[in-house]
């Protein structure tokens, strides 16, 4: 696995104060694979590091500074992932049966989708590609139940 961005340098690059809690939150985000909810990130922190409201504020700051991406599940839950050179933009898959959302490989340049032009005067801030359907585990379970 590639070496991730150094937490203190990331914080300094956006001009915010480096604190132990922010370093621990960034390291927790970098250590995991895939998407996190604010609650899951809070659960990965040592007790007393930061309250849940602080985690939400920090994630909002990372999104605002374009260091994290926010993905909204069909259930309305917000998921976050780092948006750095080690984690380029990529599509996701959301299972409608179990609710799991996970990362798919990034499109290769020759596979990139062509989107229609944005209306004149509009400014695009982000594009999100989420495949929705039934994951392989849920499909296998359904097929097994159908055979019984």
Label each residue range with its predicted role:
Residues 16, 30-33:
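Short helix-capping/hinge SLiMs at alpha-helix to coil transitions
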Residues 55-65:
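Basic amphipathic alpha-helical segments that dock to polyanions
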Residues 35-43:
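Short acidic, hydrophobic short linear motifs in intrinsically disordered regions
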Residues 2-15:
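Short, Lys/Arg-enriched N-terminal segment that forms or immediately precedes the first helix
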Residues 18-21:
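Short helix-coil-helix linker/hinge
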Residues 43-50:
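Short helix-coil junctions and helix-kink-helix linkers
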Residues 65-148:
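Non-DNA-binding regulatory cores of transcription-related proteins
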Residues 23-28:
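Pre-recognition alpha-helix immediately N-terminal to the DNA-recognition helix
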């Amino acid at each position: 696995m590639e070496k991730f961005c150094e937490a203190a340098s990331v914080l300094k690059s956006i001009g915010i104060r480096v604190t132990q809690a922010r370093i621990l939150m960034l390291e927790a985000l970098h250590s995991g694979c895939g998407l996190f909810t604010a609650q899951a990130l809070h659960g990965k922190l040592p007790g007393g590091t930061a309250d849940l409201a602080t985690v939400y504020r920090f994630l909002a700051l990372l999104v605002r500074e374009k260091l994290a991406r926010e993905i909204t599940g069909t259930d309305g839950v917000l998921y976050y992932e780092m948006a750095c050179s080690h984690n380029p933009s990529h599509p996701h898959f959301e299972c409608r049966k179990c609710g799991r959302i996970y990362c798919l490989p990034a499109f290769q340049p020759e596979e990139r989708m062509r989107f229609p032009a944005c209306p004149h005067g509009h400014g695009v801030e982000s594009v999100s590609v989420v495949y929705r359907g039934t994951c392989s585990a849920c499909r296998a379970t359904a097929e097994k139940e159908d055979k019984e």
